[in-house]
C-alpha cells in the first residue's frame, strides 16, 4: 500500500510513494503503513489501517519531512469515499506536488475528485497496445489536461504486440513513455522506426518489480534510454544516480546500493523466499549494464 523512499537532507526533494492495490494488501513494510501487523483484511480493519497510515502521513507533511506525494499502483478511485476525501484534504492543506497514476478504463473517475486549481502535480495514464479503446482514452486524457491546467498529463504504453498502435499513439501525443518493450525483435522495430524522428522524445523505462532480461539492455538503441530500478537510475552513458538526488550527482554501484532502503522488501512470494534476493538481483542487473557500457566504450 505504501512505499517510502529514503528521506534526504534536502527537504525540497523528499517524497512519499503511496502504492494502492485493488486488494488493499501491502507490498512493502514501512513506518507509514501498519498493514503488515494484521493477518486478516476485513473492511473495518482495512479502513482503520488506512486512517492510521494517513495520520502518520499528515504528521510527516506537517513537520516538513515530505514535499512530494506519489500515488502508484491500483486505483485511488476505488478507495472508500471517506479515505479518498482525507487524502485530498491532506493534499490541499500541505500542497505537495502530487503524482497520480491511472489506467485507461478508470480515467473517467479522475474527472470528479479534483477541481481546476485545488491541487497540482502530474497524472500518468497507462495504456496497452492491445486496448480497443486506446484512442478514446487518449482523448479523455487530453480533456482532463485542458480542464486541469495545474496537472502535467503523461502517457505510458505497454508496447509488446501492436507496433502500429504504438506509432499512431505516439504521433497523436508527440511524447510517449514506453514500458516493457522487452521482446528483442519488437524493441528493434521501435528504435529503428524512430531513428528518423529525432524531434520526438522517447524514453524507455523498465519497472524494477518485473523480471529483468539482460538482452533488453543490449538491444535498446535510443539516446534517451533510462532504466529505473528501486530508486536507482542508470542513464544511457552508464552513469549511476539516485532518483531522489540531483541529476548532476554521480554514484558508484556500492554507494547507490547503500542508499537503498534495505529494510523495505517486496512481500511477493518469489521475493520473500529469497531473503533479500531482490537487492542481489538489482546488483546483478547494474553489473550487467556496467559491463555492457564498458564494452561499448571499448568499441
Where do the model's predicted regions map?
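Flexible mid-to-C-terminal extensions adjoining Fe-S/redox cofactors in radical SAM and related proteins
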Residues: 1-16, 36, 239-299
Amino acid at each position: 500500500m505504501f512505499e517510502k523512499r529514503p528521506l534526504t537532507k534536502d527537504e525540497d526533494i523528499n517524497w512519499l510513494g503511496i502504492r494502492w492495490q485493488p486488494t488493499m494488501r501491502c507490498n512493502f513494510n514501512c513506518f507509514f503503513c501498519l498493514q503488515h501487523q494484521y493477518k486478516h483484511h476485513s473492511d473495518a480493519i482495512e479502513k482503520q489501517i488506512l486512517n492510521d497510515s494517513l495520520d502518520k502521513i499528515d504528521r510527516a507533511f506537517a513537520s516538513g519531512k515530505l514535499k512530494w506525494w506519489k500515488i502508484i499502483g491500483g486505483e485511488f478511485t476505488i478507495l472508500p469515499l471517506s479515505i479518498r476525501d482525507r487524502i485530498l484534504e491532506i493534499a490541499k492543506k500541505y500542497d505537495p506536488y502530487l503524482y497520480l497514476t491511472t489506467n485507461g478504463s478508470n480515467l473517467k473517475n479522475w474527472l470528479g475528485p479534483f477541481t481546476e486549481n485545488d491541487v497540482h502535480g502530474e497524472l500518468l495514464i497507462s495504456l496497452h497496445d492491445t486496448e480497443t479503446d486506446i484512442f478514446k482514452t487518449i482523448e479523455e486524457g487530453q480533456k482532463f489536461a485542458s480542464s486541469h491546467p495545474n496537472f502535467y498529463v503523461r502517457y505510458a504504453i505497454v508496447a509488446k504486440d501492436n507496433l502500429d498502435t504504438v506509432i499512431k499513439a505516439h504521433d497523436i501525443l508527440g511524447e510517449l513513455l514506453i514500458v516493457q518493450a522487452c521482446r528483442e525483435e519488437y524493441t528493434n522495430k521501435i528504435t529503428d522506426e524512430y531513428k528518423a524522428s529525432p524531434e520526438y522524445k522517447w524514453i524507455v523505462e523498465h519497472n524494477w518489480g518485473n523480471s529483468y532480461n539482460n538482452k533488453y539492455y543490449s538491444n535498446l538503441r535510443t539516446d534517451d534510454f533510462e532504466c529505473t530500478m528501486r530508486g536507482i537510475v542508470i542513464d544511457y552513458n552508464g552513469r549511476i544516480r539516485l532518483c531522489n538526488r540531483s541529476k548532476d550527482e554521480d554514484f558508484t554501484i556500492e554507494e547507490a546500493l547503500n542508499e537503498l532502503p534495505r529494510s523495505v522488501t517486496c512481500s511477493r512470494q518469489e521475493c520473500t523466499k529469497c531473503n533479500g534476493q531482490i537487492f542481489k538481483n538489482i546488483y546483478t542487473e547494474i553489473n550487467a549494464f556496467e559491463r555492457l557500457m564498458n564494452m561499448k566504450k571499448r568499441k
